[in-house]
Amino acid sequence: MGRSIFINGVSGISAQTEEAIFNNEPLVYNSNIFNAVPANYKEVIPAMALRRMSKAIKMGITTAKNALLEANINVPDAIITATGEGCKQDTEKFLETVLEQKEELLTPTSFIQSTHNTVGGQIALNLNCTGYNITYSQEDISLESAFIDAMLLLEADLDINAVLVGSVDEVSPKITSFSYLNTSEGAFFFVLSAEKKINSKVEIVAISTFKEKDVLNISVEIQQFLNSNNYTISDLDIVLLGKNGDLNQDVVYNHLAKELFSTSCILGYKHLAGDFNTVTGFAMWLTCKIFKNNHIPNVLKLNTNSCQNPKLGLLYNLSQDNTTHSLILLRKI
């Protein structure tokens, strides 16, 4: 891609707050489900509308509008949303109603609000945005797919000045409890532009996804990704690994940490935010905050390598089925 892509606004809601992380006092959870810390939704959404919204919609609209506010944008030219599992709470409501009413006299509200593109549609309605609007749902690379689409859109259409890109996933009482993983929820939105502005803080250098099972070939893919963007492993200041405690995944993460990133400052984040399909949104939000604050909290560090002024960060994540990999390269401006 020829044009530089900049992040001009960022907002996130997750199981941790910015203050908790950067004060090295993270919130502690005693169950395998980490619930997102609620934002002050009433500041962004009218009370009457708020009562009818699920958590996913509340989080999505709030983070989207806060990111736009930071970027000084009223209405974006396009909205691209990512979700791994959609609006699970409304899905549960609809399925329970189907069973309780024996498939008769069903109201459409829960069904309509359970579809994966609900959040993107609600954001567009709230902002009165009639531009390009699409939702990606590719499990663990949903957000990466959304970002790649946004970058292609900014590359192809010079009339597009601001693209709102983000992700939303939520937990639900029944469906989520089926899993024994440390799972969580969150919403993260970013305002992208091909034009560098005063409030531009981070550049998205490149994003890539690939499939590979052999750990040695994974290392080769990562090095080729960096080389294609005129960087090497030694250029990396911080590396964020999506390590989640899964023993099968640890084989890959531990190999990369020891053999490939041994000189870099390696950070983890899933021990704080849990793991879910679009958790890379938390990693991107966190990297933007590290660049902004010029500080790496000790609670994130997975090794003893230090970095006083991080300017280049690589985010690596492995899908829950251990087959799909994502790479996101971010540079501080």
Where are these regions (language model features)?
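Conserved "HGTGT" condensation-loop signature of ketosynthase/thiolase-family condensing enzymes
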Residues: 1-132, 137-144, 152-156, 166-333
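Loop/turn elements at helix/coil->beta-strand transitions in domains of secreted/extracellular proteins
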Residues: 159-161
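Short, conserved alpha-helix that lines the donor NDP-sugar binding/gating region
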Residues: 147
